[in-house]
């Protein structure tokens, strides 16, 4: 539980994530939130919610774009990833508004980077043929998995969540009913689908 007496962003963020987990936040989403909150809290964690201003957030977004922030590449975070951080902050502050701890959501007054619109990049026929050819030497389970991914356009976790009872042999249909995800903390677990059922 968080003290109602002027909590810091970090303390309140931990409370909100815990609250959302109790109310059905997906495991992978919770892990991602906590990962982003490490970077966010390093900059704005000690600031009291009431004292948080748009310029604090704008400085955070600029810092996230600096070299060294991306542990894999050594560069800055992409605009898309910075916007994801912005959305986490906005979610936390929206809860604070809802609980009447602050009068407005400061994130709505900040300026995250603009996202460039891009088209989805689909495989060409020749690329699919090359993938299927390369699969011929792989174990059957990987052949089936990749063929299902290509044929259905389903997410990896949705294919991993398939069971025999999800196959309608008469109608030649697959029913996607659960999502299989892995996190280091929980191992492999089944969750609900990202966008509804079947």
Language model regions located:
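Short, intrinsically disordered, charge-balanced linker/junction segments flanking boundaries
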Residues: 1-4, 117-118, 193-198
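N-terminal DNA-binding module of tyrosine recombinases/phage integrases
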Residues: 1-59
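Short, surface-exposed helix/turn micro-motifs that flank interaction/cofactor sites
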Residues: 31, 90, 160-161
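N-terminal DNA-binding recognition helix of tyrosine site-specific recombinases/integrases
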Residues: 36-39, 47-55, 59, 66-109, ...
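Basic, Lys/Arg- and aromatic-enriched nucleic-acid-binding interface segment
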Residues: 75-79, 83-85, 98, 102-162, ...
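C-terminal catalytic core of Y-nucleophile DNA break-rejoin enzymes
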Residues: 175, 184-185, 191-198
């Amino acid at each position: 539980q968080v003290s109602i007496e002027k909590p810091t962003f970090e303390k309140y963020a931990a409370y909100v994530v815990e609250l959302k987990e109790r109310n059905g936040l997906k495991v992978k989403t919770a892990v991602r939130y906590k990962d982003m909150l490490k970077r966010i809290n390093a900059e704005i964690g000690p600031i009291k919610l009431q004292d948080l201003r748009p310029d604090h957030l704008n400085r955070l977004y600029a810092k996230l774009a600096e070299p060294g922030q991306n542990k894999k590449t050594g560069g800055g975070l992409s605009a898309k990833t910075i916007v994801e951080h912005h959305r986490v902050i906005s979610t936390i502050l929206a809860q604070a508004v809802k609980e009447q701890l602050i009068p407005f959501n400061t994130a709505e007054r900040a300026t995250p980077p603009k996202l460039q619109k891009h088209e989805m990049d689909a495989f060409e026929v020749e690329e699919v043929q090359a993938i299927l050819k390369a699969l011929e030497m792989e174990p059957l389970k990987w052949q089936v998995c990749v063929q299902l991914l290509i044929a259905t356009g389903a997410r990896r976790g949705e294919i991993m969540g398939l069971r025999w009872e999800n196959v309608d042999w008469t109608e030649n249909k697959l029913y996607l009913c659960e999502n299989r995800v892995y996190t280091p903390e929980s191992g492999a677990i089944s969750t609900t689908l990202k966008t509804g059922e079947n």
